[in-house]
Design a protein with these regions (language model features):
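A short linear-motif detector with a strong N-terminal bias
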Residues: 23-24, 93-94, 146-149, 249-253, ...
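Residues that cap or initiate secondary-structure elements
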Residues: 24, 52, 90-92, 175, ...
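Flexible mid-to-C-terminal extensions adjoining Fe-S/redox cofactors in radical SAM and related proteins
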Residues: 198-297
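Radical SAM enzyme [4Fe-4S]-AdoMet core and its adjacent flexible, acidic
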Residues: 58-59, 65-66, 76-244
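Long, contiguous hydrophobic alpha-helical segments, chiefly transmembrane helices and signal peptides
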Residues: 18-19, 45-48, 85-88, 104, ...
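Radical SAM/AdoMet-radical enzyme domain recognition
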Residues: 1-117
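Sparse recognition of residues in long alpha-helices and their boundaries
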Residues: 24, 129, 293-294
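Sterically constrained small-residue positions within well-ordered secondary structures
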Residues: 35-37, 160, 262-264
Length: 297
């Protein structure tokens, strides 16, 4: 694994993320410190589905509360940027969305939370589509109602795939989060077309805004772009130093499965697998059509 991270860091990759359940980070004393050596432009995507034992048992088959706590403590000790990633099942952990966000804000190393509606592909024991499927708009509503920090205009569609991805930004002050997405000029997100709003007066600001609302904008780069945008807006008080540690990002990313497959959605996909033979395959089709299945025992 370390060899793979090192190889990625040697290449022209803007930001490397390690997707992990956190077990080794929690249990091996020097593991987090070794990962921290790859900063900057490196981040941990930590599986974090719930705070309750019952929900974790249902989704992961184990009570991972202690593992999560130990992993976060070790990441906090080394100051390694971390995003919490929650798979959301209706009736299981959708009532904990606000609690997860509040918990995330307590850790200085956490840069935000990524919520993913459950996708019925691969290992998904006990999933009943009629009972457990949840859509992005329901998660967005839960963020607004349960957390109480973001308003209606603070979670907006991602331009590359507005049906599947929403994003919102806040500025961190200790454990307090101040929403800022509603301050972005909304007309700058409108696709340019005849008789539409023109952007000649602020072309650079629009370019920066679109760059910020991109899945490729992460780490210190997102902090820099956010600072450039907010400096252009009136009545925005910025911290003296706006680094990545002051940015708190909330995203909702939904993927397609056999029940909601949509070719137009695949064509707009922002997330891909790169295969050893050089092909680039959308995430939504990789698990359904391309992933190798284990043979009979």
């Amino acid at each position: 694994m370390f060899a793979i991270i090192a190889a990625a860091k040697r290449r022209n990759i803007r930001h490397v993320m390690l997707n992990t359940n956190g077990i080794r980070i929690a249990t091996e004393p020097d593991f987090a410190a070794r990962l921290a050596e790859y900063m900057p432009r490196f981040e941990v995507y930590l599986q974090f589905d719930a705070l309750s034992r019952a929900a974790l048992q249902t989704i992961r088959g184990a009570d991972l509360r202690r593992t999560h706590a130990m992993a976060l403590a070790n990441l906090e000790n080394v100051g390694l940027s971390t995003t919490l990633v929650a798979t959301v099942r209706k009736g299981v952990n959708d009532g904990e969305i606000g609690d997860i966000l509040r918990h995330a804000a307590q850790w200085r190393c956490v840069r935000g939370v990524n919520f993913q509606p459950v996708q019925d592909t691969g290992r998904n024991e006990g999933f009943v589509a009629e009972q457990n499927r949840i859509v992005s708009s329901e998660i967005r509503r839960a963020i607004l109602d349960q957390w109480g920090v973001f308003g209606e205009d603070d979670m907006i569609p991602l331009p590359c795939n507005p049906d599947a991805i929403s994003i919102g930004y806040g500025l961190r002050d200790g454990t307090a989060i101040r929403p800022v997405t509603h301050l972005f000029p909304q007309e700058m997100l409108v696709r340019e077309a005849p008789n539409s709003v023109t952007f000649e007066s602020h072309p650079e600001m629009r370019a920066r805004l679109i760059e910020l609302l991109s899945l490729s904008c992460a780490g210190q780069r997102s902090a820099g772009v956010l600072h450039e945008i907010l400096c252009c807006l009136p009545l925005v008080e910025l911290p003296a130093s706006l680094g990545y540690d002051k940015v708190f990002r909330v995203t909702i990313v939904s993927f397609l499965d056999r029940f909601n497959f949509c070719l137009a959605g695949v064509k707009r996909s922002c997330i891909h697998f790169v295969t050893p033979d050089g092909r680039i395959i959308p995430f939504d089709t990789y698990n359904l059509l391309h992933r190798q299945r284990p043979g009979p025992a």
